[in-house]
Amino acid sequence: MSFPQLGYPQYLSAAGPGAYGGERPGVLAAAAAAAAAASSGRPGTAELGAGAGAAAVTSVLGMYAAAGPYAGAPNYSAFLPYAADLSLFSQMGSQYELKDNPGVHPATFAAHTTPAYYPYGQFQYGDPGRPKNATRESTSTLKAWLNEHRKNPYPTKGEKIMLAIITKMTLTQVSTWFANARRRLKKENKVTWGARSKDQEDGALFGSDTEGDPEKAEDDEEIDLESIDIDQIDERDGDQSNEDEEDKAEAPRARVAPPASARDQSSPLSAAETLKSQDSPLGLVKEVSEPGSTRLLSPGAAAVGLQGAPHSKPKIWSLAETATSPDGAPKASPPPPSSHASAHGPPSGSPLQHPAFLPSHGLYTCHIGKFSNWTNGAFLAQGSLLNMRSFLGVSAPHAAPHGPHLTAPPPPQPPVQVATGVLHGEKASARSSPALPERDLVTRPDSPPQQLKSPFQPVRDNSLAPQEGTPRILAALPSA
C-alpha cells in the first residue's frame, strides 16, 4: 500500500494481505494496481492507477476528503517533491506535526484559544460577580486597618464596604476575616495581657469606646453577629446565654418583692410587729385571745373591714398579709358549728376589730360567722356598712349602745362593754349561717320601723324589706 499523493511511494504493502489480516481486500487490490501503474509508466494504466489510488485514499482517509481533487490530477500519482507536499497539504500536518506547524487552524475559525477553561463565560478572572480569594496583598490592607484600630477592632458597615472595595473581596469575606482576626487577638491577649474578667472576655475585651453610647454599642453588636464564622463559633456563647436567662429569671422575683415591703413600711404598725407577723402567721390569732392585748387586727384586715367587700382584692404579694387577712384567719382556726344561738359576738380565734381603730362615726362590722355573706355578695347592693340592724339584734344586750353611733361619736363606755363581752364569749363558738334566721326570729320585733328612730329610716326600710321575708318563710317550714 502506498500513498503517492503524500510523497511516500516507497511505503508499500510488502506483506500483502497479512498486514491487515484479509479484512480490506478492495483497498489492498487498489493499492497494488496503483503501484503497478506507477512502475510501468503507461498512460492508460496510470489513469487507472490514479483512480484506484484516489479510491484507496478516500476509503482510508475519509475525513480528509480534500485529498480527492488532487488524486485525479495527471502525474500526481508519481513521485512528488516533499516540500511541495507540505505546502499543498498543510491542513493535514496537525495530525503529524503538533509543535512545528503554526497554520493548523485557518482564519475562518473564530474559536477561543482555550475555550474549555472558562466556565464563567466571556469573563476570565476579572468577573466582578465572582468572589476573589483572599491573597496576601488583599489581607495586608485589612491587617493595616486592624493595627490602627487595635483597641476596638469592630469596623462599621461603611468601613467594611470600603475595605471590600479596596481589597476586591466580598463583604462576607471581610466580615469573616475580622471575626477570625479578633479570635486570634483574644488568644494572644490571654497570654500576654494577663487575666481578664469574664465580661471582657465575652465581648468587651478590647475596651470599646462605645461604653457610654448604647446606640453605637448595639450597632457594634449587630455587626459582630453578622461577621461570625460558623465553623469557629466559641463555646462561651452558650455559657453567656445561660447566664442571661438566669438574670432574666431573677429579675421578676426582685420586682415582686418591693411592693410588699413598701406597704409594710407605710402601715401604722411598727417594723418589728410586721416581722413578727411574717415569722408566725398564727401570731395575730394568738394575740387576740389574750385578755390585755390591744393588737387585735392587722392594718390590712382593718382596711378590708372599713372599706367593705367591694374594695377588697386578693392578697398575693406577701405572706404576712395573706396570713392576717379576714379570709385567711378562719382557715387557720375554723370555728365549729354550735346548736344554740349566741348573742355575745364572734369567737375568740377570729381577728376582731378593736374600737380604738374605728373612725369617728363608730360603725362596727359583723362577727366572723356572717363574713361569708359579705364575700359572697349577698348584701353588697344594700349599703351593708350603714345597715347594722340586720347584723346586730335589736333587743340584744350589747346592741343597745349602738343606736347613737349612727348620728353621734361613740362614748368611751360602750366599746369597753363590747370588749368584755367578747372576752366572756370565748367559750361560746361562732354560730353557723343556718342559725342566723333563728336569732332574727327571736329578737326582731313585729314593727321595726316604729322601734328604731334614725334619719336613715327610709334607707333601712328599703334594705330590710327583702330581709324580713326570709324569717317568715323559714318560720313556716317547721309548722309544715
UniProtKB/Swiss-Prot annotation:
Chief location of this protein? nucleus
**Residues recorded with modification Phosphoserine:** 241
What's an example of a GO molecular-function annotation for this chain? DNA-binding transcription repressor activity, RNA polymerase II-specific
Q: Where in the cell is it found?
A: Nucleus
What does the record say about tissue specificity? Expressed in specific and overlapping patterns with Irx1 and Irx2 in the developing and adult metanephric kidney. In the adult metanephros, renal expression is found in the loop of Henle in the S3 proximal tubule segment and in the thick ascending limb (TAL) of the distal tubule.
List the biased-composition ranges (Polar residues): 264-280
* Record carries keyword Nucleus: yes
* PROSITE patterns the UniProt entry points to: HOMEOBOX_1 (PS00027), HOMEOBOX_2 (PS50071)
Which SMART domains does the UniProt entry name for this protein? HOX, IRO
Which PANTHER family does this one have?
A: IROQUOIS-CLASS HOMEODOMAIN PROTEIN IRX (PTHR11211), IROQUOIS-CLASS HOMEODOMAIN PROTEIN IRX-1 (PTHR11211:SF13)
Kindly provide the name given to this protein in its UniProt entry: Iroquois-class homeodomain protein IRX-1
